[in-house]
Amino acid sequence: MPNTKHLLALLTITSIAACSAPESSEESSGSAAVFNTTLTVQEVMALVLEPASDTLWGSGGWVLDASGYEELYPTTEEGWAFVRAQAAVVVEAGNMLALPGRAVDNDAWMIYSEGLSEAGLNAMAAAQSQNKEDFFQAGAKLYSVCTACHQAYNPDINNRFDIEAGDESADD
């Protein structure tokens, strides 16, 4: 009888082991994630991130000049939906910049990439709730992240806002 008990126990253990999920690892699956990083960091910035960021910055805040006071915030559901979609582009641009093949390092670059995504998420939430102050603050955070990253990784970059301000003062 002990043999029958041992055989039954062995059969039970084997059955349980056969039903359990196989261990998953990169080595056992043989396939690592593959990312298409054909676009350079500069192309991602110019073609993806900058247009979306410009939309957010151009849609938050106000202007007070000789013509008077003008709020820049969206005034329709469609307008808020559009800036929310552009904020989602900013979120994903942060992820795109963190991909292997684009990330410059695993240190500050990753912190800035994450900060970019966080600013985009903040802008998305503010657009969803149509909260003007939160939307403005999300734009400010986005500007801070962009400026800090450029100072750290490309200090020679021309800040187009400084250039535009210089052009305006030259007109005076």
Residue ranges and their predicted role:
Residues A9-I13:
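Hydrophobic helical h-region of N-terminal Sec-dependent signal peptides
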Residues S24-Y143, N158-D172:
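Extracytoplasmic c-type cytochrome modules immediately beyond a signal peptide or single-pass transmembrane anchor
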Residues M1-L8:
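Bacterial N-terminal signal peptides that target proteins for export
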Residues S20-P22:
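Hydrophobic membrane-targeting segments
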Residues L142-Y153:
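The canonical Cys-X-X-Cys-His
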Residues H6, Q151-N158:
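Short glycine/proline-enriched turn or capping motifs at secondary-structure junctions
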